[in-house]
Amino acid sequence: MPVSILVLYDRKNSAIESLARAAASGVELSGADVTLKRTTEAITADLLAADGLLLGSPNWSGITGSLKSWLDDQGDLWEDGSLAGKPAAAFTSGSGQHSGLEMTLLQMIHWMLACGMVVVGLPWGERMRVAGSYYGATAVGDMTTEDMAQARELGARLASIATKLTRT
């Protein structure tokens, strides 16, 4: 049975949605099942049912308030350890290269670590000269083919690690 990955993101009709769809295609290409949901559609059961999580937010001086609220609502999962051991990765978009993209990724990663999740990033590659970060997938301004490629790579990498973790 293939692993299932939840791609959860905040905001509709933005670069973040394009990154979410690209990451989801990477999950699918790896043979895993994927569920793509905005925070307005997702419930706790979606998170619990998934073998891994890809979490995304546009950079608004950090994650959006609505994503922060959604994550705060999952406090019981932090307390009971329900997410411990699940792999997770992050993605973000912003208007400028130095607008705080890595801080936004780190905010999401902080929540993942607090929940005991296994954080998955992107290893160095030539593509990283123009797109992405060790901390996760990124897009700056208009979406590029490199942005889409590194989001797909992150999705496939997360699915691969989720498969390895669920088979051990």
Where are these regions (language model features)?
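Intrinsically disordered, low-complexity regions
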Residues: 33, 84, 103-106
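Residue-level recognition of the N-termini of beta-strands and the immediately preceding loop/turn
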Residues: 3, 84-87, 120
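N-terminal beta1-alpha1-beta2 submodule of the flavodoxin-like/Rossmannoid cofactor-binding fold
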Residues: 1-82, 128-130, 135, 139-168
